[in-house]
């Protein structure tokens, strides 16, 4: 598990309501589980059952959490290969937190096309800001942006460019 000094809050974050908040909590739980798996091993079912005991589990989207945890663990080799292509170092040299966040974001891009890639990247950045190193969110953003250009090229081409002056 993530050490208690970096564990997710026991209450949902304020400012987000309903569905989005439930998904964010699901990602936080998945981050804990994947972090634990990367450091100590174990199987998805055991980790899933253990994290169901976390006091804010009932506020999360349990099925989405299970999908993220089990999906990342099941497809970890493929996800790691996709991520490695965009890293400036070996995956093993990344912090376990940032590596886990990249695995979640990559899994969502590949297996959840219904979620806009910008939302996936933004959620990963928020996780990295909360649980990663000082500039970890910048690194996560850079890697996922490059992955999105490959995995979601059509989506990115069809979305309007923000902050562009039409004149």
From Swiss-Prot:
GO molecular function terms listed in the Swiss-Prot or TrEMBL record: RNA binding
Keywords: RNA-binding, Transcription, Transcription antitermination, Transcription regulation
One Gene Ontology CC term in the entry: cytosol
Biological process annotations from GO: DNA-templated transcription termination; transcription antitermination
Keyword Ribosomal protein: no
Region (Disordered): 1-21
Pfam families: NusB
Function recorded in the entry: Involved in transcription antitermination. Required for transcription of ribosomal RNA (rRNA) genes. Binds specifically to the boxA antiterminator sequence of the ribosomal RNA (rrn) operons.
Family the entry assigns: Belongs to the NusB family.
The protein, known as: Transcription antitermination protein NusB
Organism: Nitrosomonas eutropha (strain DSM 101675 / C91 / Nm57)
């Amino acid at each position: 598990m993530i050490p208690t000094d970096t564990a997710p809050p026991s209450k949902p974050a304020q400012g987000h309501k309903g569905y989005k908040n439930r998904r964010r909590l699901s990602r936080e739980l998945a981050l804990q589980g994947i972090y634990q798996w990367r450091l100590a091993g174990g199987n998805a079912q055991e980790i899933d059952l253990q994290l169901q005991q976390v006091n804010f589990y009932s506020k999360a989207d349990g099925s989405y959490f299970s999908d993220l945890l089990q999906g990342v663990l099941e497809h970890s080799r493929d996800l790691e290969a996709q991520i490695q292509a965009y890293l400036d170092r070996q995956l093993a040299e990344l912090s376990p937190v940032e590596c886990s966040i990249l695995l979640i974001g990559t899994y969502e891009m590949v297996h959840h096309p219904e979620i806009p890639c910008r939302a996936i990247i933004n959620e990963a950045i928020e996780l990295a800001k909360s649980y990663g190193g000082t500039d970890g969110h910048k690194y996560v953003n850079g890697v996922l942006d490059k992955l999105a250009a490959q995995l979601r090229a059509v989506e990115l081409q069809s979305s309007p460019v923000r902050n562009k002056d039409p004149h």
